[in-house]
């Protein structure tokens, strides 16, 4: 190999090494700004029930779920609010200091972004409320569909009408027919 080719190869290798190092540093810096989305069940048991995917305490995450009825507690001396959020399973507690969105209320869907302070405690820096009464965060609705369909829960069950309700209606109509 002549000296000219050798110097070109050396320059190319140093440029590639520099680009690789710069790319690695950029990706490492961005890693801290990426907020992964979890449901409350995934915060506790991991994505797809894999314990290796449970978020670590101190990690920035986004949690989407429904505000549990009767769990909203407001500090009378400040803007601190705490409430529980669940999807179809366990609950986690969210603490937030600030003004909540106008559409925030119990029983409604929210997405909270913040830092996981304890395995079941999220210190939120931002709380986003749903848009209307039919809104459910997309990831949460997918998870609910995955859980409800295999269990044999029908759309009527999801709307509050169970097999027992349908059976009671049928029995009542038969009894009325006998009269």
From Swiss-Prot:
Residues 1-8 are cytoplasmic. Residues 138-148, 161-179 have a biased composition (Basic and acidic residues). It is found in: Cell inner membrane. Heme chaperone required for the biogenesis of c-type cytochromes. Transiently binds heme delivered by CcmC and transfers the heme to apo-cytochromes in a process facilitated by CcmF and CcmH. One of its GO terms (biological process) is cytochrome complex assembly. The chain crosses the membrane at residues 9-29. The keyword Heme applies. InterPro entries: CcmE (IPR004329), CcmE-like_sf (IPR036127), NA-bd_OB-fold (IPR012340). Residues 30-179 are periplasmic. GO terms for cellular component: plasma membrane. Its main location: membrane. Residues 138-179 are annotated as: Disordered. Disulfide bonds: none annotated. This is Cytochrome c-type biogenesis protein CcmE. It comes from the Bacteria. GO terms for molecular function: heme binding; metal ion binding. It comes from Mannheimia succiniciproducens (strain KCTC 0769BP / MBEL55E). Belongs to the CcmE/CycJ family. Keywords: Cell inner membrane, Cell membrane, Cytochrome c-type biogenesis, Heme, Iron, Membrane, Metal-binding, Signal-anchor, Transmembrane, Transmembrane helix. Heme binds at residues 131, 135. It is a single-pass type II membrane protein.
């Amino acid at each position: 190999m002549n000296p000219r080719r050798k110097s070109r190869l050396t320059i190319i290798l140093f440029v590639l090494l520099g680009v690789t190092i710069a790319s690695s540093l950029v990706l490492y810096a961005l890693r801290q700004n990426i907020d992964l989305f979890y449901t409350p069940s995934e915060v506790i048991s991991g994505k797809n029930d894999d314990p290796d995917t449970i978020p670590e305490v101190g990690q920035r995450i986004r949690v989407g779920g429904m505000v549990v009825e009767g769990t909203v507690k407001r500090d009378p001396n400040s803007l601190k609010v705490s409430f529980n959020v669940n999807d179809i399973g366990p609950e986690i507690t969210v603490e937030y200091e600030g003004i909540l969105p106008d559409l925030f209320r119990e029983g409604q869907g929210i997405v909270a972004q913040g830092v996981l302070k304890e395995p079941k405690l999220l210190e939120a820096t931002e709380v986003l409320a749903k848009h209307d009464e039919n809104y459910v965060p997309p990831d949460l609705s997918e998870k609910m569909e995955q859980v409800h369909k295999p269990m044999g829960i029908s759309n009527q069950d999801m709307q509050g009408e169970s097999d027992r309700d349908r059976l009671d209606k049928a029995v009542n109509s038969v009894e009325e027919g006998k009269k």
